[in-house]
């Protein structure tokens, strides 16, 4: 009993511990609550300013989920030569059903099989099969339910502008990819990669394109990304085997040859052709092709990340004993928009084939994130969170808000039964720990005392700690809540498109224009930026940091009517008229473009106004909010159909209005609204609420709206003038009518 009683802490000791905890609880809780509130405020502001502009994963989505392998998609390319291919958006292919003028890459995404009933995280490794005027596209699709690759197939009847998902062509118990499809002796075969099975299999179509049967095992080795080509009287097989001894992954290439694609196959004398250096493009990057008598091989440059880009090689010598290839230019311009481009980070596979017309068509996959990006972002996010927590704990401890008390009895042996316990290793270890903890405690106390002094150095120290904490909170929010960090374009009816930005400016605003161009040129759907130069010495196009072409259109007369002048060089139907003193996120711009594509007969913009009263009076957005609706959209930030809007503005019926605009140097946007309303009995305007927008016009000495009251008075007179000529504006449209909430 005595031994048992000794095991319990004494009453006085327990009371002391409880008293210390009670005394520390209140300031500790208050400090932690305050720190959490501060972190939440910082994180909330950062989320609103930065993260809210990213395309965030939909928690209700069944496909297109974040995946460590990437977010691969597939694009179409055309050209007179396989060495000079251009993306589909530069070919002027359109689809009015999806308001895609033009259709833009990517043409196939994870949404394609997902909407077809087969949820997928990405699509990659595309191979074409040309059958007359019909294109069949076979590709790897990362199935959500099994988290492995299956072979999907889609069909196009318009040479790749639109695609219909047909289903899953091949599904095995192991991962499948790289579906090399070819025809031999009137049979259609598929040779997919399935290296987990440790053999290279050949399948034959029994009912093309969805039903296949195993024909035979070609090679009993786990070959990767195998491609066939018939050349100089033999069939050649190019592949990689990463199980070879001393081989660097993604850096090995070997060749096999045979008289028939059905085998038997013999190894090339020089195998392995490559065995190290992932940047050389050893791993195949698609189908080999013959052009003007020469054989070309696409390979993957895997330096930095898997599948970083496609390299093209011209094969100068290929025999059973010798092999030589030299790099040549791929002929495809690399994306410049980083994560905001569907292939901005990597592209690792291309399949180019010649059509009966003589032209060439190609499919290529691409990704906006590097390999392992989702895992890396989670790691960085949690590290930022833990560092922020550690800093809060440190500051609380130093300031005395948080205390850590360890009772001395913790280190005392729990029994007195035997004095021999004093010589046991456990007891010696306890004494050593106690000495160390006492020493650490003294040092901590001394540090707390020094940091408690009110000196400028201590103030600076805690400011630095606070700054580091703020940075880590932002890091945590950015990487944990920011999706893949891209401001992605939205699709309409499964297709992407592009628009042209038009802005009007003067010499005095050149500094502003440069910021404008640099920012908006990175938006994914922007095709070109047209600068309407109204006055002064104009710059050259190369004066701007832009990822898209910038065209300076110099006007002879300084007039606001120039904003809507017809321009035959504009290659897109959609135009975003945007003042050069307005800055908003690319994500908001992309939302506006999607809404316009849903209703291309409307003007879709970001600045609503409610025009009413007798007589009509021009008021700000606050008035529209008070009225809970709007009937006018300012064209200083609005999408419109350039073919309709520009021709309408420069029609004979609009001449009196244009003359009034030119005379008053104001109200061109109001005139456009009256012309739209006069041309249709249906709705003509729609609003999209931006996450945030910065209007720098008040900072400019040349802005016509700098004097607000004078500006409003002029516009009120414009309303009376235009109403007398063109009739009234439409009735009010309520905010918050869209299901997605973009117009609240």
Swiss-Prot record:
The superkingdom listed in its UniProt entry is: Eukaryota
Q: Name one GO molecular function term.
A: metal ion binding
Keywords, in A-Z order: Disulfide bond, Manganese, Membrane, Metal-binding, Transferase, Transmembrane, Transmembrane helix
- What are its cofactors? Mn(2+)
Where it sits in the cell: the answer is:
Membrane
For the keyword rRNA-binding, the answer is: no
Instruction: State the InterPro entries in the record.
Output: Exostosin, GINT1_N, Glyco_hydro_beta-prop_sf, GT64_dom, Nucleotide-diphossugar_trans
In what tissue types does this protein appear? Highly expressed in almost all tissues.
Q: Where are the active-site residues found?
A: 669
Q: Cellular component terms, GO, for this chain's entry?
A: membrane
Q: Which positions are annotated as binding substrate? A: 534, 558-563, 579-581, 609, 665-669
Protein name as catalogued = Glucosamine inositolphosphorylceramide transferase 1
Q: Which gene encodes it?
A: GINT1
